[in-house]
A protein has these predicted regions:
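N-terminal [4Fe-4S]-dependent radical SAM core
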Residues: 1-45, 52-66, 81-88
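Conserved Radical SAM active-site core
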Residues: 24, 40, 58-141
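Non-cysteine beta-strand/loop elements that form the S-adenosyl-L-methionine
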Residues: 143-146
Length: 146
């Protein structure tokens, strides 16, 4: 008999402000990381993951609810304060949880980071990845800025 894996609903409430700006559910921020991409990184850990891996490094990020909601502008302003530490190879890494669950935010955030010449990295298991439909269209857009 095969065990059924439960479906986990992703909480999509409060992901956009009244003015249309996307909000990220942020778990935590590391301002000086050296293992999550090239050079010195500003690392953003987003909330939400449906995989529940037994040996997950960040199980506290699984839950999608967060008291820390931030716009791309707010998060980028916080990151840019540390830009002088990044050197030529550093930048911003977004991790999680599963970062692709907040795709709309990522597109906006990485687009704004690239406009300021910031190197970006995405840490993902790609679990929600689909090579069809709206997801793939958004993923292709995100890759332009990653």
């Amino acid at each position: 008999m095969t065990e059924q894996i439960p479906t986990i609903e992703y909480n999509t409430e409060n992901t956009e402000r009244a003015d249309g700006k996307k909000l990220a559910r942020v778990h935590s921020i590391e301002s000086f990381g050296s293992v999550d991409g090239p050079g010195i990184r500003f690392i953003v850990f987003l909330k939400g993951c449906t995989m529940r891996c037994q040996y997950c490094h960040n199980p506290d990020t699984w839950d999608t609810h967060s008291d820390q909601l931030m716009t791309a502008d707010e998060l980028l302003a916080k990151a840019i304060r540390f830009k002088s530490y990044w050197g030529a190879n550093g930048g911003i890494t977004v991790s999680g949880g599963e970062s692709l669950l907040q795709m709309d935010f990522l597109i906006e955030f990485f687009r704004k980071a690239k406009a300021q010449g910031v190197h970006t990295c995405l840490d993902t298991s790609a679990q929600p990845f689909r090579r069809t439909g709206v997801f793939f269209e958004k993923f292709e857009e995100l890759m332009q800025y990653t």
